[in-house]
Amino acid sequence: MSEEGDLEKIILKHALINAIKHGGKAQVGAVIPKVLGEYPELRARAKEIAEKAAKIVESVNLMPKEKQEETLKKEFPEVRLEQERKEEQKKLPSLPEVESFKIVVTRFAPNPDFVIHLGNARPAILSHEYARIYKGKFILRFEDTDPRIKTPLAEAYSQIREDLNWLGIRWDEEYIQSLRVPIYYKVARELIMKGGAFVDDTSKENYEEMLSRGEVHPNREKAPEYNLELFEKMLSGHYGEGEAVLRVKTDLSYSDKSLVDWVAFRIIDTDRYPHPIVGSRYIVWPTYNFASAVDDYLMGVTHIIRGKEHLQNTIKQKHLYEHLGWRQPVAIHLGRLRLEEFIMSKSQIKKILKESGGAYSGPEDPRFGTIRGLRERGITAEAIREVILTVGAKQSDASISFANLAAENRKIIDPISPRLMFVENPVELIIENGDGSCIETKIPYHPEKSEIGIRELKICSGDRILISKADYDNALSLKGGELRLMELGNYRIDGLKAILVSKDLSYAREKGLSIVQWVLKENSRHAVLFMPEGETLITKSGTIEDTEKLKEYVGKNVQLVRVGFAILKSFSPLVTLIFSHE
């Protein structure tokens, strides 16, 4: 680059990009490294560039945000095109057969036997997003018709609602299947009378033997009236648990016998296995495939987004729709989604909680891949949504690294997280400023957001500060025993004294000194940082600065200087934090 105008133009480009990324306000300190990174040969002119950048950034910050975006698009179309290309990559593909429906209706249908995890959140987010894109309707439906095997938990209904709300998911209608059982009975009677179902009153073993011999149950060929009478007997309590089921007639030629004449209703002893909502009111319960298919039709669902483990269920449900003359919704099957190094299996988490003896706090433990666990760890709903939309609606299995999730989260929380000083395993040092003088310093809570505030500190000779033992030992291991106390000065460590050598930052840079965080002892609180690593929860004890704002940050993301991002969980009686990521 040789022309003066070219230099100003490249500074303008990075000033505009930085401003648009940060709410319309660019920072000189962020623009200069971008310019020098793109043109390393300009490093010798760093002072000149800094002066020009200050003026250009000032003019950019005076522009309305719309003007900034307009200027970037006009002057630097390649930058805008690159942004649009990245947005296009995250755009969801169109739903199939949309034009054949008056309105797009999607649903999320969890079993309330536990809280939801990242894998469950995928169909919820995608279904909600598609309904939003097509200005359609989104339904939340609790599928809780198995009080024996997949027993619903009374607390799970509200927990799932809370998790969905936190994720930014709002639903237009809500249904609970256990409150709709009479509707399923009505449809079952209709199905029987259309010749689409029969009552199997043999044992499971006898039925499987018949199938293996190529035979069918005698009731399959009986009149609808006969099977309806048997079904009414099921409802009246004539049969006990396991003595009779209602089966949907299917193609008998399937090699996979689980698809043949699948079970639509079974008897459950609800005196032994009461339902958390309806207790023992019903003993005949619809299976997942029956209740789900019926509700999808009655609720007008047009597109079902669910895991590919439901591929066979789509085949099963096809026969029910054909018997009743209903149109089957379009099914989109997703591959499994895994979050590397996290436990996501419901059954495994339940087992751990049962057997751990209190070592885990519950479904919200930050070592779990539950939505509550990720939230507890400081992962934002926006970051979860972003990675889900990036993965999209693919049938292939996908694995998300925590590093990728953390990268998305960092983009969201870095611009808003206050910086706090945390010192692990602290060593106490006495300050000596040479002539007994004091040093006044102003330390911003955020390097680019002055509105977040600053701390004003006055450090005098005789004051006691705390630094980490690791930083203390590192300084002593170096020739000269020097380090720089962040935003304060350069000090030589002599035993338990910190003796001022110089205030200039350039001195520290020339000598390659470590720039370390510190806490004024009289303005400190004991703190514990919990760091999840796989199935382990490491505890780090230390000291955190007791600023006037600390209490305000409870429940919020913060950045511990030179440690990483964390979420502040409690202020009193003890400051506790959970590590999020670097």
Protein language model features and the residues they cover:
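N-terminal Rossmann-like or analogous alpha/beta NTP/dinucleotide-binding catalytic cores
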Residues: 2-28, 34-219, 309-343, 352-357
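Proteolytic maturation boundary segments
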Residues: 51-59, 63-96, 436-467, 512-515, ...
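Glycine- and acidic
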Residues: 106-113, 139-146, 297-305, 365-371, ...
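Structured alpha-helical segments in the cores of large, soluble enzyme domains
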Residues: 122-132, 156-157, 161-164, 280, ...
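Active-site cores that bind ATP or allylic diphosphates and position pyrophosphate for catalysis
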Residues: 190, 194-350, 359-360, 370, ...
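C-terminal accessory/binding modules appended to enzymatic or scaffolding proteins
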Residues: 38, 101, 437-582
